[in-house]
From Swiss-Prot:
It is found in: Cytoplasm. This is Peptide chain release factor 3. GO terms for biological process: regulation of translational termination. InterPro entries: EF-G-like_DII, EFG_III/V, G_TR_CS, P-loop_NTPase, PrfC, RF3_C, RF3_dom_3_sf, RF3_GTP-bd. The keyword Aminoacyl-tRNA synthetase does not apply. It comes from Aliivibrio salmonicida (strain LFI1238). The gene is prfC. Residues 8-277 form the tr-type G domain. GO terms for cellular component: cytosol. Keywords: Cytoplasm, GTP-binding, Nucleotide-binding, Protein biosynthesis. GO terms for molecular function: GTP binding; GTPase activity; guanosine tetraphosphate binding; translation release factor activity, codon nonspecific; translation release factor activity, codon specific.
């Protein structure tokens, strides 16, 4: 297969949802339909050791939530699909945000009983930054759900995207009979399959087929025909151009737990979602089909292999081909390095990558030299843009039970901040260490990892900090004056960037007023 064909068949996407909308189950079933796993292990398998394939860090096993981002690759419908599993728990937004910068499309999973929830809104704001195309899956149709038309209206009004239903549910809860596939003009009858059983389904061609009346009863068949007439008249038609601009989403209905509807959604995703896209670098746009290799690091994760205390840098290949042993230019450090041991993933199971193409995600072993946002090329000095750091919303002071281990604590915190697990701030005026996060769970993760990886026992204390802002000023004199007058509120983050630590929002607003030439930023490019 030629290079252009290889790139053309790649589909790289992430799943976004509110916690508990069924994202981990969908991930499992996507892999099941892609034949990547033989048995779908659903989260918190009661009394069994069957943990979900994409939830593999110790803490995740305990809590039954997907905390870290795993990458899985599988073939489907003539394409090679790269699925980036994003942390679904309330608290893991920052990693999730960054993962969304590494994909070409997203699958939005909505609990049909609840509709659009808070976390989904936040994640959609991030996809807006790059107008990412979105495919929607309305999940849990085998439970009592809200009126489907009402949920579509909610998606349209709250997320600002037109909805084009591709399939439409027939009943719900105990009365869920299947879906009518509008594009194919056929009814697919629901039979529940669980775990790793993909059930045989029966399809009935045509909405007016008398077989449908026999299968679901005359009364229901009549009301389905009437409802669909209204739906097809009122809803948007699918428009590929609008989908690719992120303005319209195709919508599928089903139940991930019942193994139903996921394959229809995958067929749509592989058919319509874009192949690897052009990516903006500071110097120029980089096309996926360029022959020379380039890529950027969007995530660093420690301890992927409990047997080795290693860290893996996840790299999205933007253009060209990776081959085992090739030389790359690590642009930030200016060093040429030879990469012979990059890995591909199936959630915690690794395989050595011999060859990978634009759109693929590979893992580089990292001994502390690679940071989030780093660009690698075959020589050209490029810097890919759009990989953000987000100002934390929660803060704690961290201190040691054993004061002699200050050095290990600092080393551990700086390494954890480089991989985006948490942000660290060192005030200019004292020896405190302040930890900032986007969600509470990150604090637990940091303490448990400091203990298991750095042998450091740390505890938190409350601290009155409302928010943090990165400060920049093009006028050197003004910056000096600003620093002199605000010493008590200034700190350096893990990358030694000057940060304003605001005890209250009022304090921050006053500082912004007093120093109009200083920029206070809530996000910072890596």
């Amino acid at each position: 297969m030629s290079f252009l064909q290889e790139v053309g068949k790649r589909r790289t996407f992430a799943i976004i949802s509110h916690p508990d909308a069924g994202k981990t189950t969908i991930t499992e079933k996507v892999l099941l339909f892609g034949n990547a796993i033989q048995k779908a292990g659903t989260v918190k398998g009661r009394g069994s050791n069957q943990h979900a394939k994409s939830d593999w860090m110790e803490m995740e096993k305990e809590r039954g939530i997907s905390v870290t981002t795993s990458v899985m690759q599988f073939p489907f419908n003539g394409c090679l699909v790269n699925l980036l599993d994003t942390p679904g728990h309330e608290d893991f937004s920052e990693d999730t945000y960054r993962t969304l910068t590494a994909v070409d499309s997203c699958l939005m999973v909505i609990d049909a009983a609840k509709g659009v929830e808070d976390r989904t809104r936040k994640l959609m704001e991030v996809t807006r930054l790059r107008d990412t195309p979105i495919v929607t899956f309305m999940n849990k149709m085998d439970r009592e759900v809200r009126d489907p038309m009402e949920v579509l209206d909610e998606v349209e009004s709250e997320l600002g995207m037109a909805c084009a239903p591709i399939s439409w549910p027939i009943g719900c809860g105990k009365e869920f009979k299947g879906v009518y596939h509008i594009h194919r003009d056929e009814t697919i009858l629901y039979q529940s399959g669980h775990g790793h059983e993909i059930q045989e389904v029966r399809t009935i061609k045509g909405l007016d087929n008398p077989e449908l009346d026999v299968a679901i009863g005359n009364e229901l068949a009549l009301s389905v025909r009437e409802e669909l007439e209204l739906v097809i008249g009122a809803a948007h038609e699918f428009d590929l151009e609008l989908f690719l601009k992120g303005e319209l989403t195709p919508v599928y209905f089903g139940t991930a737990l019942g193994n139903f509807g996921v394959d229809h959604m995958l067929e749509g995703l592989t058919e319509w979602a874009p192949a690897p896209q052009t990516r903006e670098a500071t110097e120029r746009p980089v096309e996926a089909t360029e022959e020379k290799f380039s890529g950027f690091v969007f995530k660093i994760q420690a301890n992927m292999d409990p047997k080795h205390r290693d860290r893996i840098a996840f790299m999205r290949i933007v253009s060209g081909t990776y081959t085992q042993g090739m030389k790359m230019n690590h642009v930030r450090t200016g060093k040429n390095i030879s990469i012979s041991d990059a890995v591909t993933f199936m959630a915690g199971d690794r395989a050595r990558a011999e060859v990978a193409y634009a759109g693929d995600i590979i893992g580089l072993h990292n001994h502390g030299t690679i940071q989030i946002g780093d660009t690698f090329t075959q020589g050209e000095n490029l810097k890919f843009s759009g990989i953000p750091n987000f100002a934390p919303e929660l803060f704690r002071r961290i201190r040691l039970r054993d004061p002699l281990k200050q050095k290990q604590l600092l080393k551990g915190l700086v390494q954890l901040s480089e991989e985006g697990a948490v942000q660290v701030f060192r005030p200019l005026q004292n020896n405190d260490l302040i930890v900032g996060a986007v969600g509470v769970l990150q604090f637990d993760v940091v303490v448990s990892r400091l203990k298991s990886e750095y042998n450091v026992e740390a505890i938190y204390e409350g601290i009155s900090v409302a928010t943090a802002r990165w400060v920049e000023c093009s006028d050197g004199k003004m910056q000096d004056e600003f620093q002199r007058k605000n010493q008590t509120n200034l700190a350096l983050d893990g990358g030694n960037n000057l940060t304003y630590i605001a005890p209250t929002m009022v304090n921050l607003n006053l500082a912004i007023e007093r120093f109009p030439d200083v920029q206070f930023r809530a996000t910072r490019e890596h």
